[in-house]
Amino acid sequence: MIKKIGVLTSGGDAPGMNAAIRGVVRAALTEGLEVFGVYDGYLGLYEDRMIQLDRYSVSDMINRGGTFLGSARFPEFREEHIRAVAIENMKKRGIDALVVIGGDGSYMGAKRLTEMGFPCIGLPGTIDNDVAGTDYTIGYFTALHTVVEAIDRLRDTSSSHQRISIVEVMGRYCGDLTLAAAIAGGCEFIVLPEVEFNREDLVAEIKAGIAKGKKHAIVAITEHICDIDELAKYIETETKRETRATVLGHIQRGGSPVPYDRILASRMGAYAIELLLQGHGGRCVGIQNEKMVHHDIIDAIENMKRPFKGDWLECAKKLY
């Protein structure tokens, strides 16, 4: 019977992580469990930096961005002897299970702990919305709001100067955030990692828009596809239109979480405790069709893939 649990946040931070921690803590305490927060993710787990949390530890946290427990990259956690130390640190406190909030890299750490016999539950916390087994991740909707607001501001100045603007959006190798923001922001052109990119084709489309009387345009592109400063120079040379590139960067990860992220994080945190009390370990939580679901964390990492929203892209093209 589980009596004590740990909770940590790992990888890149996302708005709503604090709400998720709060959900875990409050639900666990309601069920009579003790909760330990781990500072700085797996690094803190290895370095034995933990603190017992009570209801007041998470007061006034639901509206705060970032993660008050901190997060850190710790690639050494892939080493078994490092994980063995982490498990021993938890066991000496009587911790029976661990809730991990983060992206697929964080899930990999939880998977490896599970394979060593220590039960973990993963919650999807990343603005990239690139975790399998869930329709949405904690932080995605807040980041979407931030990106759309930035696009709206860029449109104001692009319109004033009859300029082409390129805006680079986070997402790693998933275009969900870019695609949704582009539709909501009315972007004329969208470049995604799921679709082969050819800059000559993009310029041809921009020229076609200019020929139809288009005075300005916004190109939304997911990070890591190309150097957008070089792309801006190329577009300006080919179209003879002033072109500017904007990298939104880490501003997308910050800010107070929007209501949906607060609700999603709270539900997922409480559901993680429900699963642990039912004897589940090695699972990851998701939301599908607005219902809480859980999947085998190993299967989610190794076999499940997020479907590409091709119908969304086709819709966007009709609206150019």
Swiss-Prot record:
PANTHER family linked: ATP-DEPENDENT 6-PHOSPHOFRUCTOKINASE, PHOSPHOFRUCTOKINASE
Gene Ontology terms, MF aspect: 6-phosphofructokinase activity; AMP binding; ATP binding; fructose-6-phosphate binding; identical protein binding; metal ion binding; monosaccharide binding
Pathway the protein takes part in: Carbohydrate degradation; glycolysis; D-glyceraldehyde 3-phosphate and glycerone phosphate from D-glucose: step 3/4
Pfam families reported for this sequence: PFK (PF00365)
Active-site residue numbers: 128
Major subcellular location class: cytoplasm
NCBIfam families: PFKA_ATP (TIGR02482), PRK03202.1 (NF002872)
Enzyme Commission identifier(s): 2.7.1.11
Subunit record text: Homotetramer.
Protein's job: Catalyzes the phosphorylation of D-fructose 6-phosphate to fructose 1,6-bisphosphate by ATP, the first committing step of glycolysis.
Catalytic activity: beta-D-fructose 6-phosphate + ATP = beta-D-fructose 1,6-bisphosphate + ADP + H(+)
Gene transcribed to yield this protein: pfkA
Family in the record: Belongs to the phosphofructokinase type A (PFKA) family. ATP-dependent PFK group I subfamily. Prokaryotic clade 'B1' sub-subfamily.
Protein name: ATP-dependent 6-phosphofructokinase
Names of the cofactor(s): Mg(2+)
Record entry for activity regulation: Allosterically activated by ADP and other diphosphonucleosides, and allosterically inhibited by phosphoenolpyruvate.
InterPro entries reported for this sequence: ATP_PFK, ATP_PFK_prok-type, PFKA_ATP_prok, Phosphofructokinase_CS, Phosphofructokinase_dom, PKF_sf
Binding site for ADP: 22-26, 55-60, 155, 186-188, 212, 214-216
Record GO biological process: canonical glycolysis; fructose 1,6-bisphosphate metabolic process; fructose 6-phosphate metabolic process
